[in-house]
Amino acid sequence: MFINRWLFSTNHKDIGTLYLLFGAWAGMVGTALSILIRAELGQPGALLGDDQIYNVIVTAHAFVMIFFMVMPMMIGGFGNWLVPLMIGAPDMAFPRMNNMSFWLLPPSFLLLLASSMVEAGAGTGWTVYPPLAGNLAHAGASVDLTIFSLHLAGVSSILGAINFITTIINMKPPAMTQYQTPLFVWSVLITAVLLLLSLPVLAAGITMLLTDRNLNTTFFDPAGGGDPILYQHLFWFFGHPEVYILILPGFGIISHVVTYYSGKKEPFGYMGMVWAMMSIGFLGFIVWAHHMFTVGLDVDTRAYFTSATMIIAIPTGVKVFSWLATLHGGNIKWSPAMLWALGFIFLFTVGGLTGIVLSNSSLDIVLHDTYYVVAHFHYVLSMGAVFAIMAGFVHWFPLFSGFTLDDTWAKAHFAIMFVGVNMTFFPQHFLGLSGMPRRYSDYPDAYTTWNTVSSMGSFISLTAVLIMIFMIWEAFASKREVMSVSYASTNLEWLHGCPPPYHTFEEPTYVKVK
C-alpha cells in the first residue's frame, strides 16, 4: 500500500530515500535562489530593485541549503541508508521516531517559504541578529515564521540525533566494538552528538528572540537591560558546531570512497581518523566567538579564540594526509566518485587555508563581512559538503537503486560542476580582499569584472545541475543492473545485493573476531 509504505514508513531504507529526494528537491530551490543572487550581482545597478527582497533571497538560500539540502541528504539520507547496513542492524533503534524526524521537515520548509510570502519577508541573513530581526526593523510575521521553521527543523535533527546515537551504540553485534565500526558510522555518531548539544542552545536563543518580538521581553534590548551580543553568543555556540555537523558526515563518505577506489581494504590511520573527528567535534564547541571578532571582545579573548581556532587545523590536517596516504600505492580506479573525492580533498583544503587566514583576529577585522568570508565558506560547503554528497551519491547509487549511472555522463557532470563552482567562488577572494562587503545587492563599478566572472560561473554550475537530473533519468530509463561489487567483504553495506532486500539482518548478526 503506497500510503503505508511512504507516509507511515518505519523502514530505514525508505526513510533514507525520502530524505534523499527531499534534499535533492530542496537543493533545486536553493540553487534557484543562488542564481537569483548571482543574477542581481552580475552587473552594477539594480535587477530586483529592492534591497529587502534581495536579503530575503540570501537568507532563504542559506536556510534552504543548510537545513533542507545538506543535512537531510548527509545525515538523513546517507545516514539512514548506510548506518544500519554497516553495523549489521535490522533497522534504526526508533523506527517511528525516524519517520517523524523526516516528516517534520516539509512543514518546516513550508513555514520558511511562508515567511517570504507574508509582509516583507525575513531579510535578516541566516544569523537572524537582533535588532535587525526585532519587531521594529522587521515588523510583521516573517521573522516569527522563520523562527518556527527553525524550531521544527531543530526538533527533527535532535530526534534524528537521539536515534543515531542509540542505534550506533546499542545495535551493533555483541562482538563488535565501537572501534570496529566503519568511519562513516563514526562520523554520523559524532555529528549526532554535536547536534544534540548545540541545537538546544539555538532553540533557547531564537525563543528569546521570539519573546522579545512578541511578549515585550528585553533579552536582546539594551533599553530593558538586555544585550544583542548575548544573542550572538547563543547563536554562534550553535552556529559553529553546525558547520562541523555539515562537513563531518562528508569526511566519513570521503574516507569510504577514497578507500574503495584505491583498492585498499581499510583507510590509512583508522584510529587517527576517529581521533581527528572526535577532536574536531570537541574543538568545534570552543571557538564560536571567532565569528564575533568585530563586536568589541577583550584582546585576551580574541587571542584565545584565534589560537583555539587554529588548533582545529591539526586534526583536519591529519584527515587530509590520511586520505592522501590511503591513495598512496593503491590500484586507483578513476571512477566518477573518485573524481568527486579528489576534488573534495583539494578544494576543501583550499577552503581550510582561507579559514586559517580568517582565524587571525587582527586580519578578520578587515575581512569580516566581506566576500572573502563568503568565498571561504562556499569553498568548504559548495565544494566540500556538496562534493562529498556527490561522491557518496554516485558511489552508492547502485546500492540505493539497483541501477548504474553512465560513466561518461557522470564524469562530464563532475568536470562542468568543477569548473562552475571554482569560477563562481575563486574570484570572490579578490572581491573580499578589495573590500567588497557581503549582503549588498549593488556595488561600486570597480568590482564589476570579478562579479561578472562569478555570475558566469554560477550559470555553468546550473548547467551541471541540469546534466545531473538528465544523468539520473538516463540511469532509470536504461535500467543497467549491477553485475558485481568489488571488495564486498570489507564493505558490509554491499553484502545483500543491489538494491538490498526490504528487510536486512532479520536474524541477529554474528561477527567472527580473529
Swiss-Prot record:
Keyword flag Metal-binding: yes
Predominant cellular place of this UniProt entry's protein: mitochondrion
EC number: 7.1.1.9
Residues the record lists as binding Fe(II)-heme a: 61, 378
Top EC class for this record: translocase
Gene Ontology biological-process entries: cerebellum development; oxidative phosphorylation; response to copper ion; response to electrical stimulus; response to hypoxia; response to oxidative stress
CDD domains hit by this protein: Cyt_c_Oxidase_I
Mitochondrial matrix side: 1-14, 81-93, 167-185, 256-271, 325-337, 394-408, 474-514
Membrane topology annotation: Multi-pass membrane protein
Pathway: Energy metabolism; oxidative phosphorylation
Cofactors required: heme; Cu cation
Chain sites annotated for binding heme a3: 376
Database matches in PANTHER family: CYTOCHROME C OXIDASE SUBUNIT 1
Name of protein: Cytochrome c oxidase subunit 1
Organism listed in the record: Mus musculus (Mouse)
Gene that produces this protein: Mtco1
